[in-house]
C-alpha cells in the first residue's frame, strides 16, 4: 500500500508541475452524473478535476514549494488542474457552480504563480478573460478609427458634391 501512495504522490506532483495552476474545491452533494458533467465541462478549457486524499495533495504541493492554507479543508476535496489557462478553468468552475446550486466551494488555488485564497480565486473567476479583454481593446481601437473613416468619407463626398455642382453650373 505504501508503494501505491508513493506512486499517487508522484502522479499528483507531475500534474502540479505540468499545470498552469490549480484550484482546491470542496464539493457538496455531488452525484456521479454531476462529477461526469463537471469533468466534461472542464475538458473544454484544458483542465481536469481529481478527487484526492488531503494528505497526498498537501504533501505534493509542499514538495513543489507552494504554501496553500490548509486550515479549512474539511469535507470532500477535489482539485482542478488547469493545463492551459487557470483563469478560464476558474470561470468554468464558477459557471458550473451557478448552474448546480453552489455545490462547489473555492478553498484555495494557485493561478499565474500566485497563491490565492478561495475568495481571491472566486474574484479572479469573475474578471473578464483574456479573450474578452482583447475584444474590448479591439473595440476601443476600432470605434475611433471607424469614426475617422466616416468623417473622411463625408468630407470627400462633400468635395465631390461641390465639384459636381460646379460642373453642372458650367
Curated annotation (Swiss-Prot):
Chain's gene name: rplJ
Disulfide bonds: none
Subunit composition and interactions: Part of the ribosomal stalk of the 50S ribosomal subunit. The N-terminus interacts with L11 and the large rRNA to form the base of the stalk. The C-terminus forms an elongated spine to which L12 dimers bind in a sequential fashion forming a multimeric L10(L12)X complex.
Domain of life assignment: Bacteria
Function description: Forms part of the ribosomal stalk, playing a central role in the interaction of the ribosome with GTP-bound translation factors.
Origin species: Chlamydia felis (strain Fe/C-56)
UniProt record similarity statement: Belongs to the universal ribosomal protein uL10 family.
Single GO BP term: translation
Keyword ATP-binding appears in the UniProt entry: no
Record-given protein name: Large ribosomal subunit protein uL10
UniProt entry keywords in alphabetical sequence: Ribonucleoprotein, Ribosomal protein, RNA-binding, rRNA-binding
GO-annotated molecular function: large ribosomal subunit rRNA binding; structural constituent of ribosome
Cellular component GO terms, alphabetical: large ribosomal subunit
Keyword DNA-binding attached: no
